[in-house]
Regions:
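Flexible loop/turn connectors
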Residues: 255-355
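An alpha-beta-alpha
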Residues: 194-235, 342-355
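Short beta-strand elements in bilobed, periplasmic/extracellular small-molecule ligand-binding domains
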Residues: 114-125, 207-210, 228-251
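Structural motif
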Residues: 122-142, 193-194, 242-263
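Flexible loop/hinge segments that line or gate small-molecule binding clefts
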Residues: 150-195, 275, 301-313
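Hydrophobic alpha-helical segments within soluble ligand-binding/sensing domains
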Residues: 183-210, 229, 250-259, 277, ...
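N-terminal helix-turn-helix/winged-helix DNA-binding helices
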Residues: 23-29, 69-102, 106-108, 117, ...
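N-terminal helix-turn-helix DNA-binding module of bacterial transcription factors
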Residues: 1-87
């Protein structure tokens, strides 16, 4: 016969192991934490909901509760919490194209800023398709998001208006619809295009041409308007030249239109977006070094690809951090206090790239 001797120490160790194993199998409750910490369930609730100062919970007690909750792998019941508060602490983001570096950066910055305020971001990409945008927004609302930040696409006015009429907290980003009374945050596109065009003229270029998308969206219309105003103010109204690329096939449009512009005297290009820049740079490269060396180039938003092009490309840098902080601030305020329409137009920074 064998004798098994188990000390009190080993019994405690075994109990802890068994307890942790059992804890992993069941949902840990506030009551479980309270029993382990030797305090009331209410006290645990105050600490875990960030109300320890409000209810004057001692720091040592609060830290003990947090430590035990962590050791027990406590996961809050978000569904129950949202039912009590009516909030899920989630925000829906819809961008037009997540592969666009500008919108990728927007998503990254928003995730960071939202986390600081206790929010999680769910996002989707509309691919500039109104029906797809509507579907994504519907899915986000079904998931219970507290509010929406949307980069609207063409022909989405009625849908955006319906969200506003339903009192859903919405902030439009980068683009907006002047006829709809809804909050928005965007670049001052008119000023940005005006400054960019003036830079080309002041640099000695005689006939800058603007390249835009053939879309009926405010950010593009304002950029075209800024270009035209700068040309007019410089006494070059008759030399205003805007070419429009098809948004679904920009490279094909650029190959067809840009050589004609150069042949007709265009000596510089203002690109309406960074994606337009990328499409056009390939076309300009194919025109040969003689053309490249003489053409002035300015775009919107930087891109790592610009560093490898044969000619310097100056650009308007959008203050993405400021834009996101403003938009998130408005959205959170509307979620907490009800919809109040606010609008922000931020100024861009012109970045001159030396030859």
């Amino acid at each position: 016969d064998y004798k098994i001797i188990i000390s009190n120490y080993h019994i405690v160790i075994c109990k802890n192991v068994i307890y942790k194993y059992m804890s992993s199998l069941k949902k840990i409750s506030l009551k479980d934490i309270a029993e382990a910490a030797g305090v009331s369930t209410a006290l645990v609730s105050f600490v875990l909901n960030g109300k320890k100062k409000e209810y004057r919970v001692g720091e040592e007690t609060a830290q003990r509760i947090l430590k035990i909750a962590n050791e027990m792998n406590y996961q809050p019941n978000l569904a129950a919490k949202s039912l009590r508060s009516g909030k899920t602490k989630t925000i829906g983001l819809v961008v037009s194209d997540i592969s666009n570096p500008f919108f990728s950066q927007l998503t990254r910055v928003l995730e960071d800023e939202a986390t600081k305020q206790g929010y999680t971001v769910l996002f989707g990409s509309s691919d500039e398709d109104a029906s797809k945008m509507n579907h994504i927004v519907g899915s986000l609302l079904n998931k219970g998001v507290d509010g929406l930040m949307i980069v609207p696409c063409e022909n989405s006015e009625k849908f955006i208006a319906s969200l506003v009429n339903d009192n859903i907290p919405v902030v439009l980003f980068d683009r907006y619809f002047p006829e709809i009374n809804v909050s928005y945050v965007a670049l001052n596109n008119f000023n940005a295009a005006y400054v960019s065009t003036k830079y080309l003229l002041d640099s000695g270029y005689n006939a800058p041409c603007m390249v835009a998308y053939d879309v009926n969206l405010i950010h593009m219309k304002e950029r075209v308007r800024g270009y035209k105003k700068a040309m007019s103010d410089a006494g070059k109204k008759k030399m205003i030249n805007v070419v429009f690329l098809k948004q679904d096939s920009p490279k094909k449009s650029a190959d067809r239109l840009l050589p004609k512009m150069v042949e007709s005297g265009a000596d510089a290009f203002l690109f309406g977006t960074n994606m337009i820049s990328l499409a056009c740079l390939y076309t300009i490269k194919d025109m040969g070094q003689e053309v490249i060396s003489k053409i002035g180039l300015v775009g919107f938003d930087g891109n790592p690809v610009f560093d490898f092009f044969y000619s310097p490309i100056s650009y308007i840098r959008q203050p993405i951090d400021v834009l996101v902080q403003k938009a998130l601030g408005i959205l959170v305020d509307n979620i907490s206090n009800g919809n109040t329409v606010q609008s922000v137009l931020a100024e861009g920074e012109f970045i001159e790239m030396a030859p």
